[in-house]
Structures are given as C-alpha cells and as structure tokens.
Amino acid sequence: MKVLIIRFSSIGDIVLTTPVIRVLKTQLDDAEIHYATKIQFKSILQHNPYLDKIHYLNDSLIELINELRAERFDYVIDLHNNLRTWQVKTSLGVKSKSVNKLNFKKWLLVNFKINYLPKEHIVDRYLQVCSKLGIKNDALGLDYFIGDADEVPIDWLPISHRFGFVAYAMGAQHATKKLPLNKMIELCAKIGRPLVLLGGTGEVEDAEKIRVHFETKVARTIIYNACGKYSLNQSASILKKSQLVFSHDTGLMHIAAAFKREVVSIWGNTVPDFGMTPYRTKFTVLENTRIDCRPCSKIGFSKCPKGHFKCMNQLLFDFELYS
C-alpha cells in the first residue's frame, strides 16, 4: 500500500506527526510511506528510516501536485487540512482522510473561554485519522533522527557543561509565547545549574544579555549561549545530551520529548488545553492560571493585545530541581 502523509509546517507540528509515520510503516503490510512538506523543514524528516520518500513544496504547488500524481498513491493522510492540502487531495483523486483541527472549539475557547476541546493529545487525534487502515498507537512516543554529521560532540561545549547541563529552548514563533528578558533571567537564576541557551538568530541578542548578566555575578548559573550557532539538528543533538529541558511552547519542546527528556514547558498566551503538551515524556507545566484573558490566540501575537502581558510577567516559577 502506497500512502502519502501531508503536513507542510512547522517544526513542532511535523515532529508531532512522526508516530503516524512509524505505525503506518511497521503495521501495514508492504507499506510504502511518502511525506509532503515544505523544503525549509527538510532536516526534520530526512533521516527518518520509516519514510521511503519525501516530496518538498518549494514555490509552486502545481509542481508538487504533478510530482505526487506520478506516484499513484492508494491513500492520502492529511494532517494539515488547509486550502493547499485540499487542492492536493482533490488533484490526486484517491481515498483520503483529514485531521479535524477543531477550529470552532478553539475559537470558543479563545473568544469566550468556553472549553469544549477533548482531553486528548493532538498525536492521538492524528493517529485516529489512520484508524480505518487498521493501525494502532504503539505507545512509543515521538521520533527524531539525527545524521552522524549533525551530532554535536560533548567537547564542543564548555568544560563547565560537559558533566551535565540543563537546556533552555528560549525561542518561539510569536513574542507572546516567550518570556520577556527579565523573566528569562529570573528563570535562569532559579535553575541555578550549567545552562545551555538554545534558539535561532532572533534569540542571540537576548541570550547574550543573559550570559553577560550571570558572568558578572557570583552565581551557580553558568551560561553557554548556543543561540544562532547550531543548526536545528545540532540543537536537537544538544537537547539529547541534556539532563532537563525548559522550553516555551515551541518546536524544540517536542524534539526534547522525542528524546524522552524531562521537560518543563512554559505557557504564555497559548494553553495546554489545545492538546500539544510534551508527548509521552515526563513534563511539568508552568502557566499563569490566575488571569482570565488566556488563551488570547490559538497561535500567538507580536505583543500582548491587552498591553499588560500578565500571562508571562506574573508567571511564578514554582518548581524545584533536585540533584
């Protein structure tokens, strides 16, 4: 059976589809599993041994559709369910099943704080999309595979971090999903251990300010600013070596879960009720439940729409770390 999975973006969402890839490949007889995604997310899936072929969306959806038509798929699993994936399914003209994104229920929660969302993780809902094919959840969690060239040797890290460290994935796609700088510093001080800051080029400036802050103090927190220095897969390699991961609601959180790292997940304007907490790994949720304005979006904003950003500014770091 030749099956196409579609999920065009983004990092975390694609990682959350990996159990579907695995169970289809291992539970269907003679399964040939293909995946369609955007070219910029190539590194997430390129080493996945359960995939037979990956198809990339560049600028032209028509080119991708023509490429997919030539494959003559038996079944399409749409885990994105938007206008472009509808165009793909319609053009291919084969049996398909799409995930229900529960957008109306999310809208009710965001706009009226009425919560009819199921107490169910998005991964389990993804797997239900494939139920007609006879597959079952194998309870193995998420997958993330790194090529040998992207494995970061431990001696690339400072000596202070080679015998154990905590990772902090400090980035996020939207500002309202990230702690402000002063709260990041407060968090790092509370952690009080050798700490690797992970993120992209957008986090470099704040990460350097955090490093300088602790460099000028006598503190147990020793900062290595890795932001902007490593590729996504290299950052994943660092996560895999960590003892504990702190993360905003972002892609690296799900990659950490794939490696079965313990995660402390930090939530601002979004909420765990959306069904995207760390999957099948030990985790703790840090969120401000004392305010009535969250969630204010199912995704995020460039700034707090009310101007006070209480979800992060008043967040309590009520956790304890043990040796």
Model-derived features: where do they sit?
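Catalytic machinery of carbohydrate-active enzymes
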Residues: 1-323
